Amino acid sequence: MYTRSKVVGPGLGTSSISRDHAGAGQRRELGLQQNRRQSLEVAAPEGPKMERQGHADQGSAGTYTLIAPNESRRQKIQRIAEQELADLERWKQQNRAKPVYLVPQRLGGSQSEAEVRQKQQLQQMRSKYQQKLKRDESIRIRKEAEEAKFQKMKAIQREKSNKLEEKKQLQEDIRRATFREHHQSKTAELLSRLDTERRNRSACLIAPPATQSSRWKLPVLLRDPSWAGSQAHRDSPQKEDNPRLQKTRDGHQKNKLLETKGQHQEEERAQIHQAEHWRVNNAFLDRLQGKSQPGGLEQSGGCCNMNSTDSWGL
């Protein structure tokens, strides 16, 4: 292996050393100038604006720009900072934790290990019973809430059924009153017509004797056989009028009796229908109540089978 060794002559060595000394001297001079400028800028008092601008131009002549600080603002900021630090120290002194003084007492060792284990076992056994009691209590509260809900539903259904029955009863009363008024008006009209016919016939019966005065004026009418036949024909219905009126009155009484009987039958039918409606509603509410209870399906099963055909067939 061969190594290269740098051979430096006497001329080259002296030139490099002199160059290094010259560069170090130049750097030292530049550093001294910059330090002098900085000391002049810091020590100079606040002058007019042109003087500050001249210093800024002198400072910017180097490699960087130096901005003079605002002394009033700096002092104000320092004063505020010192005041805040003093306030912080004062607050720390005021809110410092106070010493705690406790009465000395004996900690632990009052019970034996067997007693502690027995106590833990009792607490564990009681916890099981307490959980069971809590579960039963929650079930009871849920059942009470469901029962209250079903009772509310039943009350709403009863109120609706009562309103429906009242509405039906009102409509039935209005219909009966209308029918009664119509029947009375028709009966009065029939009776008035019969009375007018009877009066007309009685007037016709009374009118023939007045023809005797006109016998001298109209002798031909008495001798006319057609007039005599018509007079006899008029007299014959008058004789049959009394039995016919009696029959009409009897028929009117029979109609009244039939009407009262029909009203009684209709009232009985309405009462039966209302009782059946109440029975169906009670069966439906009993089924709802049976479903809300735990064993309600088995208890209300027979009732549902007995009432299913009659209740939904309405």
Swiss-Prot record:
Coiled-coil blocks: 71-180
Gene ablation phenotype (knockout): Down-regulation of M1 macrophage marker genes, including Il12a, Il12b, Cxcl9, Cxcl10, Cxcl11, Hif1a and Il23a, and up-regulation of M2 marker genes, including Arg1, Ym1, Msr1 and Ccl17, in M1 macrophages. In bone marrow derived macrophages, impaired induction of M1 macrophage marker gene expression and impaired phosphorylation and nuclear localization of Rela/p65 and Stat1 after LPS and IFNG stimulation and enhanced M2 macrophage marker gene expression after Il4 stimulation. Reduced number of MHC class II- and F4/80-expressing cells within the population of M1 marker-expressing macrophages.
Biased composition annotated in UniProt, kind: Polar residues: 305-314
InterPro entries, sorted: EPSTI1
Annotated region described as Disordered, given as residue ranges: 1-72, 227-272, 289-314
Inducing stimuli: Up-regulated in macrophages upon induction by lipopolysaccharides (LPS) and IFNG.
Biased composition (Basic and acidic residues): 18-30, 232-272
Tissue: Expressed in the spleen, with expression in T cells, B cells, natural killer cells and natural killer T cells and high expression in monocytes and macrophages.
Sequence intervals crossing the membrane: none
UniProt keyword annotations, A-Z: Coiled coil, Phosphoprotein
Keyword Magnesium belongs to the record: no
Phosphoserine sites (modified residues): S39
Biological process according to GO: cellular response to lipopolysaccharide; cellular response to type II interferon; gene expression; homeostasis of number of cells within a tissue; inflammatory response; macrophage activation; macrophage differentiation; protein localization
Function: Plays a role in M1 macrophage polarization and is required for the proper regulation of gene expression during M1 versus M2 macrophage differentiation. Might play a role in RELA/p65 and STAT1 phosphorylation and nuclear localization upon activation of macrophages.
Official protein name in the record: Epithelial-stromal interaction protein 1
Species whose genome carries this gene: Mus musculus
